[in-house]
C-alpha cells in the first residue's frame, strides 16, 4: 500500500477547513448540509470523511483552525509603540467587522452550542493565554504593566468583536472612548512613576 504524504494531506485538510468554515459562515450552521460543504471543497461527501471522523469533528476543527487564523490576522495589526495605539483603537474594529464579521458570528454559533461548549472553553482559554503573553511582550514598549494591559486588551477585543457581530456603533464608540482615555492616563501615570 502506498504511504500517504502527510504534508500534502495536512495542506489539503487546511484548505478543506477554510472552505467549509467559509461555507458555514455564509449559510449558517444549521442551514448548511454535507452536500454544500462537499461542493464548497470540490470533493465528494465521502471524501470529507477521509479528513474528519464526523461532521462534528469537521465543525470543531475548522472553527478552531480558522479562528486562530483570524486571531493571527488581528494580532498582526496590534500596536507595538505608544504612538500606534490610537490608530489601532480607531481603525481595527471597523477592519475586523468588515473582514471577519461573518466568521465571528459563526464562531459564537459553534462555541455557544451545547454540543461544542467545551471546545469553546478550551479555545478561549488559549485566547486568554495568547493575549496575556502579548501584554507581557508589550509592557516594556508601552510602559504599562502587563497586569494592567491584559484587561485593557480584553475590553478592546470584546468591544471589537461585539461590533463585528452587531455593528453597534454606540457600544463600540463608548468603550473605545473610555479605552483611549484609560490608555492615555495610564501611560502618563506610569511614565511619571518611572521618572527619577
Predicted regions span which residues?
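N-terminal intrinsically disordered/low-complexity leader segments
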Residues: 1-11, 194-196
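Helix-turn-helix
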Residues: 15, 19, 23-57, 61
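Solvent-exposed, amphipathic alpha-helical segments
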Residues: 15, 19-26, 72-77, 106, ...
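Hydrophobic alpha-helical connector segments
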Residues: 61, 74-101, 146, 150-153, ...
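Short, basic, alpha-helical segments at the C-terminal edge of helix-turn-helix-like DNA-binding modules
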Residues: 64-71
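Amphipathic alpha-helical packing segments from all-alpha helical-bundle domains
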Residues: 71, 99-102, 115-151, 177, ...
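Helix-loop "lid/cap" segments that line or gate small-molecule binding pockets
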Residues: 90-99, 105-115, 186
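Amphipathic C-terminal alpha-helical segment
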Residues: 106-109, 150-173, 184-195
Amino acid at each position: 500500500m502506498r504511504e500517504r504524504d502527510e504534508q500534502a494531506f495536512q495542506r489539503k485538510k487546511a484548505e478543506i477547513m477554510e472552505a467549509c468554515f467559509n461555507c458555514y459562515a455564509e449559510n449558517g450552521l444549521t442551514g448548511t448540509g454535507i452536500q454544500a460543504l462537499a461542493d464548497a471543497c470540490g470533493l465528494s461527501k465521502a471524501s470529507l470523511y477521509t479528513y474528519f471522523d464526523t461532521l462534528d469533528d469537521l465543525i470543531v476543527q475548522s472553527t478552531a483552525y480558522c479562528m486562530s487564523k483570524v486571531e493571527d490576522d488581528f494580532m498582526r495589526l496590534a500596536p507595538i509603540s505608544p504612538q500606534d495605539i490610537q490608530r489601532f483603537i480607531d481603525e481595527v474594529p471597523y477592519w475586523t467587522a468588515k473582514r471577519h464579521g461573518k466568521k465571528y458570528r459563526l464562531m459564537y454559533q459553534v462555541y455557544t452550542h451545547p454540543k461544542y461548549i467545551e471546545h469553546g472553553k478550551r479555545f478561549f482559554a488559549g485566547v486568554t493565554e495568547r493575549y496575556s503573553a502579548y501584554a507581557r511582550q508589550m509592557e516594556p514598549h508601552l510602559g504599562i504593566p502587563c497586569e494592567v494591559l491584559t484587561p485593557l486588551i480584553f475590553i478592546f477585543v470584546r468591544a471589537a468583536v461585539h461590533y463585528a457581530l452587531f455593528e453597534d456603533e454606540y457600544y463600540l464608540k463608548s468603550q473605545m472612548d473610555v479605552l483611549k482615555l484609560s490608555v492615555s492616563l495610564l501611560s502618563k501615570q506610569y511614565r511619571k512613576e518611572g521618572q527619577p
